[in-house]
């Protein structure tokens, strides 16, 4: 993967997260802010989820209260380089725990 392909994929990921949160009708207030290559989800309880790009590695990193995860793009999806879990699964689990109600990005 080259840098422009990585940026296209990461931009698509950011856009999908933002669109899904805009369409989400849960009781919790989840704010989404994008600043440069960093996307921050802020929850009512003050906790945050940080998603950022690691361009030199062509990875997306996810930081949650439960821990940090690094994702490589494989077979058309972002996969954790340690556990093999999918990005969307880990993001939904973390967002659900931090929001105190079920959150879906799919």
From Swiss-Prot:
UniProt keyword Repeat present: no
GO molecular function: ferric iron binding; ferrous iron binding
UniProt keyword terms in alphabetical order: Iron, Metal-binding
Record Pfam families: Frataxin_Cyay
A single cellular component GO annotation: cytosol
PANTHER family: FRATAXIN, FRATAXIN, MITOCHONDRIAL
Family to which the UniProt record says this protein belongs: Belongs to the frataxin family.
HAMAP family hit by this protein: CyaY
Record protein name field: Iron-sulfur cluster assembly protein CyaY
Species, as recorded: Cronobacter sakazakii (strain ATCC BAA-894) (Enterobacter sakazakii)
Gene behind this protein: cyaY
